[in-house]
């Protein structure tokens, strides 16, 4: 048996986290999948890979020594051109890697980042491989909300050959798609969560009870008044129980530009740097509630039964909405309503019910890929 037939084209730490259970499932069958990395995000990539017991990327489609990650939309065209140019220049090498064991070549992409459609195009058009999309079929119903994620998903759906959809709703969204559509019953995030949920957590300096917030999407932070409104509501709420706001460098720069640093203190509304997944999830699981604009974190809250407000206008995952996970439509009054009622919103824990990565790996095995 050769070393590999499957390559993941990925670009963010979130993608690495969510494909980790699939990667390990394939490896358990005697193959060693490859990771080709677009460097859409590079912060803490090496640490995240080490946390997940995964190797360094086999190929950097943006040279590692010059990679700096995407921080603004204006950087996307140059990044995309670099990725495409390197994939084209190395096409013979990449094709050889995909076919070295004689099985059908396969590229896997994930989710809805810029890397998702670009990886699909590289796999299909440049490398002439079959392409599978993990977490396929999510739709918000609006190209503009969220932008660019909704567009990325739709482009990928037109290219790929296999769609691994996390629920019957996404399967239905793909009813006219070409290729194979597989219902994995849940997001692979639930499998990644099992790798992290019981890990150690540093609670030193934190209050016994706290809420936790992460707000980072372009559609929110680019709209100064909406971002200000959300942070002011959280600041006011933190006087009742402290709130920990996990902010990356772009959010901190935006807070500074809007003159909002004075909202935060070290007692009630506490700002902290983002944590790696294996450190963040155990912390989040101990929060009383979550306020986020992350679809992935909202799904994790659903699986944990942890009260969560999704501060977005629309969501591509309405199947997670209900008493536990609430969509605010980016309205301040709805966010406040959640904060007033979160104590009654704790739901059922689904952690042991779903195993989507097993379904994906078994499907790939049945199709002769592993």
Residue ranges: model-predicted function:
Residues 326-370:
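Leloir-type glycosyltransferase catalytic cores
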Residues 31-86, 90:
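Conserved nucleotide-sugar phosphate-binding/catalytic loop shared by glycosyltransferases and other
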Residues 132-147:
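A short, histidine- and acid-enriched strand-loop-helix "catalytic/donor-clamping" loop
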Residues 36-38, 42-43, 156-224:
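A nucleotide-sugar donor-handling region in carbohydrate enzymes
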Residues 1-39:
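N-terminal subdomain of nucleotide-sugar transferases
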Residues 41-43, 48, 199-286:
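Donor-nucleotide binding loops and adjacent catalytic segments primarily
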Residues 109-110, 117-121, 134, 163, ...:
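A donor-sugar binding/catalytic signature common to diverse glycosyltransferases
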Residues 92-114:
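Short N-terminal targeting/anchoring amphipathic segment
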């Amino acid at each position: 048996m050769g070393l590999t037939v499957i390559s993941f084209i990925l670009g963010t730490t979130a993608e690495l986290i969510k494909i980790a259970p699939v990667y390990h499932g394939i490896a358990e069958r005697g193959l060693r999948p490859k990771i080709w990395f677009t460097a859409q995000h590079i912060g803490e990539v090496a640490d995240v890979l080490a946390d997940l017991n995964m190797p360094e990327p086999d190929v950097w489609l943006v040279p590692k020594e010059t990679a700096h990650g995407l921080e603004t939309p204006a950087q996307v065209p140059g990044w995309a051109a670099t990725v495409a140019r390197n994939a084209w220049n190395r096409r013979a090498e990449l094709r050889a890697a995909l076919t070295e064991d004689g099985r059908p070549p396969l590229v896997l992409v994930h989710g809805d980042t810029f890397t998702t459609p670009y990886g699909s195009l590289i796999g299909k058009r440049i490398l002439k491989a079959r392409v599978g999309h993990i977490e396929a079929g999510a739709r918000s119903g609006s190209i503009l909300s969220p932008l660019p994620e909704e567009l990325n998903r739709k482009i990928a759906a037109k290219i790929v050959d296999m769609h691994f959809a996390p629920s019957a709703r996404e399967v239905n969204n793909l009813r006219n798609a070409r290729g194979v559509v597989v219902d994995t019953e849940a997001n692979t995030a639930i499998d990644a969560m099992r790798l992290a949920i019981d890990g150690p957590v540093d609670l030193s300096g934190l209050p016994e009870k706290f809420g936790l917030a992460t707000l980072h999407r372009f559609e929110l932070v680019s709209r100064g008044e909406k971002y200000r409104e959300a942070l002011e509501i959280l600041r006011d709420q933190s006087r009742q129980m402290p709130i920990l706001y996990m902010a990356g460098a772009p959010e901190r720069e935006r807070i500074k530009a809007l003159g909002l640093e004075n909202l935060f203190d070290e007692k009630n509304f506490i700002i902290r740097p983002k944590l790696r997944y294996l450190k963040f999830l155990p912390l989040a699981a101990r929060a009383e509630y979550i306020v986020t604009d992350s679809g992935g974190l909202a799904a994790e809250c659903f699986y944990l039964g942890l009260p969560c407000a999704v501060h977005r206008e629309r969501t591509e995952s309405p199947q997670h909405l209900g008493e536990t996970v609430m969509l605010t439509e980016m309205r301040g009054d709805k966010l406040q309503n959640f904060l007033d009622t979160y104590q009654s919103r704790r739901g059922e824990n689904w952690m042991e019910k779903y195993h989507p990565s097993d379904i994906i790996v078994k499907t790939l095995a049945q199709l002769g890929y592993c």
